[in-house]
């Protein structure tokens, strides 16, 4: 049986970052991707925002990896000529009753190490964005946008330069764990299906990470978290936008609210909303997601957007695209932290599961990759125990 030093399952932005990290550490690395191209799921269907790190509980993985990852990502974009823009973001209170929540958000961001936040009055916010309606706002200058496809191309390029190989049309079919021998036996599908043993495996399968974990014979099912999928639709603005910064309402249950984001060409889009899908079951066949945008959802978008942009014209929104967020808690539950589950948690040398890697996963991809590679390699297990 062929042996491979490291395998990454999933070629989204986090999986590619993990493969890059492992390959740059000198490990022979193979990336298994079930689709015919990299980054076709969550990594390609999001807001493409570089988050500052405002929203997450102090000392959570989301907070620490977002703040560290944001700095790493801006530097990576600069050195790899990836299109990006540090355009800034306004989080708005649209009534006096919301202003205490805005103050709490500023306090949370500062506790997380976001040191450039500015509280603005309504007049100060409108001086920056005249079309905005709010009673107060929080300016986050370090928030930005990035070409996610260009980012993934650069990550893959670095990984391949360091010796990694990407295997497309190669879904993981099954695996097995043997506590008595090192390594994890994996079997991949596709025309060139393989059976091999890997010393290090990072499960970066995103939406399907629980299914991948369930396919590993011998892995305790009790350690596989619940799996929920939250669909989010986006609508594009017809015509020019009057805004030069991102505009976010205060966060809501399940997401960050229907916000205004910009692409690198200056076109505006709005989203995502939250539509909970039927729960996928670990161990069951993967059903392909339905990414169609329901035009009937537009009415709710107009209502949400007009809270902070009352002048949004009628018939200005057109369906754009939808994405699906992997979650490990369901409707009504507080947002969960990233779950980076390594040998310190499950006792299986070399195996790391990445569960619930939703936003800010893109921002944090390089920091997540370092953490996951440390756990898979075992070189910094003490640090992982202390901070993971």
From Swiss-Prot:
Keyword Nucleotide-binding: no
Any one Gene Ontology molecular-function term assigned to this protein's record: 2-hydroxyglutarate dehydrogenase activity
S-S pairs: none
Alphabetized SUPFAM superfamilies for the sequence: FAD/NAD(P)-binding domain (SSF51905)
Alphabetical list of InterPro entries matching this protein: FAD-dep_OxRdtase, FAD/NAD-bd_sf
Catalyses which reaction(s): (S)-2-hydroxyglutarate + A = 2-oxoglutarate + AH2
EC supergroup of this enzyme: oxidoreductase
EC number: 1.1.99.2
Biological role stated in the UniProt entry: Catalyzes the dehydrogenation of L-2-hydroxyglutarate (L2HG or(S)-2-hydroxyglutarate) to 2-oxoglutarate (alpha-ketoglutarate). Also displays some oxidase activity in vitro on L-2-hydroxyglutarate with O2 as the electron acceptor, but this activity is most likely not physiological.
Family: Belongs to the L2HGDH family.
Name of this chain's protein: L-2-hydroxyglutarate dehydrogenase
Annotated organism of origin: Accumulibacter regalis
Lineage of origin: Bacteria, Pseudomonadati, Pseudomonadota, Betaproteobacteria, Candidatus Accumulibacter
């Amino acid at each position: 049986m062929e042996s491979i030093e490291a395998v990454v399952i999933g070629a989204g932005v986090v999986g590619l970052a993990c493969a890059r990290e492992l390959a740059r550490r000198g490990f022979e690395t193979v990336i298994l991707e079930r689709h015919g191209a990299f980054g076709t799921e969550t990594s390609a269907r999001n807001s493409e925002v570089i988050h500052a790190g405002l929203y997450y509980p102090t000392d959570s993985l989301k907070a620490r990896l977002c703040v560290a990852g944001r700095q790493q990502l801006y530097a990576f974009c600069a050195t790899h000529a990836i299109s990006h823009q540090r355009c800034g973001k306004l989080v708005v209170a649209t009534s006096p009753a919301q202003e205490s929540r805005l103050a709490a958000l500023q306090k949370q961001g500062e506790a997380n190490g976001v040191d450039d936040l500015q509280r603005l009055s309504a007049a100060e916010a409108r001086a920056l964005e005249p079309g905005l309606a709010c009673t107060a706002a929080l300016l986050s200058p370090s928030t930005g946008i990035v070409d996610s496809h260009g980012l993934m191309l650069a990550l893959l390029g670095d990984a391949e330069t360091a010796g990694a190989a990407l295997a497309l049309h190669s879904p993981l079919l099954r695996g097995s764990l043997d506590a008595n021998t090192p390594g994890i036996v994996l079997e991949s599908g596709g025309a060139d299906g393989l059976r091999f043993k890997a010393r290090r495996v990072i499960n970066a399968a995103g939406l399907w990470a629980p299914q991948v974990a369930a396919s590993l014979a011998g892995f305790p099912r009790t350690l596989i978290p619940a799996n929920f999928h939250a669909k989010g639709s986006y609508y594009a603005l017809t015509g020019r936008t009057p805004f030069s910064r991102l505009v976010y309402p205060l966060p809501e249950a399940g997401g960050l609210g229907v916000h205004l984001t910009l692409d690198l060409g200056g076109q505006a889009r709005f989203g995502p909303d939250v539509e909970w899908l039927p729960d996928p079951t670990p161990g069951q066949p993967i059903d392909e997601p339905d990414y169609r945008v329901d035009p009937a959802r537009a009415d709710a978008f107009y209502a949400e957007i007009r809270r902070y942009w009352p002048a949004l014209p009628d018939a200005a929104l057109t369906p754009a695209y939808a994405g699906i967020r992997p979650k490990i808690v369901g409707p009504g539950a507080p947002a969960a932290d990233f779950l980076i589950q390594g040998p310190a948690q499950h006792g299986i040398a070399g195996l790391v599961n990445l569960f619930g890697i939703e936003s800010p996963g893109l921002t944090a991809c390089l920091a997540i990759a370092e953490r996951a590679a440390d756990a898979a390699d075992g070189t910094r297990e003490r640090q992982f125990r202390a901070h993971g």
